[in-house]
């Protein structure tokens, strides 16, 4: 049985609402995060450990962080990958956040080196502890629900 790691890591995972929305994640609670076909994103997913926390980012129209999930199952083969190259992880809903929009993140020089700003097309990326803390504070300051 795998146990949670001592050092928690933080991640951001993007989804297009037409494919998988935050509302669907909340309703389902735990779901596999499949369909990732980028080698860098897959490399990050292989580093994820049970208990790591993830920001759910809704891309395309909203472009906003919507909530927090945790890794509940580590990397394993993705059943949607016919070539059997890529894998997936399971994520579990933790809580909603007041939205933090990409425009707010880009406007803050603190995030100049944040992968969401520098590598905009990457769908899975690490978040440093300081970035995580700042994003959570930004959410707490926002008045949107």
Language-model segments: residues:
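Charged phosphate-binding loop/patch that engages nucleotide di/tri-phosphates or the phosphate backbone
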Residues: 127-145
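Short, charged, solvent-exposed linker or helix-capping segments at domain edges/interfaces
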Residues: 24, 100-105, 136-138
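Short, acidic Gly/Pro/Ser/Thr-rich loop/turn segments
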Residues: 18-20, 98, 134
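Short acidic/glycine-rich loop or secondary-structure boundary segments that cap or lie
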Residues: 20-23, 63-66, 79
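Short, charged beta-turn/beta-strand-edge "cap" motif at the junction between a beta-strand
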Residues: 57-63
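Aromatic- and Lys/Arg-enriched surface recognition patch
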Residues: 66-125
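Compositionally biased, charged N-terminal/linker segments
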Residues: 1-49, 140, 145
């Amino acid at each position: 049985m795998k146990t949670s790691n001592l050092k928690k890591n933080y991640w951001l995972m993007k989804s297009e609402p037409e494919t998988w929305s935050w509302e669907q994640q909340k309703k389902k609670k735990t779901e596999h995060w499949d369909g990732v076909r980028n080698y860098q994103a897959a490399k990050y997913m292989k580093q994820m450990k049970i208990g790591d926390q993830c920001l759910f980012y809704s891309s395309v129209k909203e472009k906003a962080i919507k909530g927090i999930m945790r890794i509940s199952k580590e990397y394993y083969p993705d059943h949607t990958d016919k070539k059997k190259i890529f894998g997936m992880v399971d994520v579990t809903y933790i809580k909603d956040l007041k939205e933090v929009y990409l425009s707010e993140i880009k406007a803050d020089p603190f995030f100049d080196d944040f992968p969401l700003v520098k590598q905009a097309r990457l769908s899975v990326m690490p978040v440093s502890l300081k970035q995580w803390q700042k994003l959570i504070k930004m959410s707490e300051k926002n008045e949107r629900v």
